[in-house]
C-alpha cells in the first residue's frame, strides 16, 4: 500500500516537473522568437519550398536559374513565392515537386503548407515557429521518458 502511494507521489512529482521544464523551455523559445529582429534565408526558403508554385528557389540558388538575374523582382513576386493563394491551397504536389529538388524530407513542408493553406494571402513567421515549438515540446517529453526508463534499468 505504501509503495503504491510512493509511486503515485513520484509520478505526480514527475508530471509537475515535466510541465515546469517544458513551460520554461517554451517561454525561452517564445521570448527568443519575439525578440528576433532578423530572419535567416532558411526561414524564407521554408515558406518558399512549402508554398511556391513556380520555382523552387526565388533567386536561383543551387540551380542557378538564369531568368531572374539582373531582373527587377517586385514585392508581389516575393509574396507569391512564400504565401498560398486561393488556387494553390492544399496543393501538395508542388510541395513534393519542390522537395524533390531539395535535400530535406517533405513532412515539415507539407505541415507548413497545410497551415498556410488555411490562411491564403497571409503570412506569419509564427506558423513555422509553431511547428518547431510543438516538435520541441514533444521531443522533450520523449527524451524524459527515454532517460527515466534508462535510469531505472541501471
Predicted regions and their residues:
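Interfacial juxtamembrane loops and adjacent helix segments
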Residues: 51-104, 118-119
Amino acid at each position: 500500500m505504501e509503495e503504491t502511494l510512493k509511486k503515485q507521489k513520484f509520478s505526480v512529482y514527475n508530471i509537475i516537473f515535466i510541465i515546469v521544464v517544458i513551460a520554461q523551455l517554451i517561454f525561452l523559445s517564445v521570448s527568443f522568437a519575439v525578440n528576433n529582429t532578423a530572419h535567416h534565408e532558411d526561414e524564407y526558403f521554408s515558406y518558399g519550398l512549402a508554398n511556391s508554385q513556380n520555382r523552387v528557389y526565388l533567386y536561383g540558388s543551387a540551380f542557378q536559374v538564369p531568368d531572374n538575374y539582373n531582373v527587377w523582382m517586385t514585392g508581389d513576386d516575393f509574396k507569391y513565392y512564400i504565401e498560398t493563394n486561393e488556387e494553390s491551397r492544399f496543393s501538395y504536389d508542388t510541395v513534393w515537386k519542390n522537395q524533390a529538388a531539395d535535400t530535406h524530407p517533405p513532412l515539415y513542408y507539407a505541415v507548413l503548407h497545410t497551415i498556410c493553406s488555411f490562411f491564403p494571402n497571409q503570412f506569419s513567421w509564427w506558423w513555422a515557429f509553431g511547428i518547431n515549438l510543438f516538435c520541441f515540446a514533444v521531443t522533450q517529453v520523449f527524451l524524459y521518458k527515454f532517460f527515466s526508463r534508462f535510469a531505472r534499468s541501471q
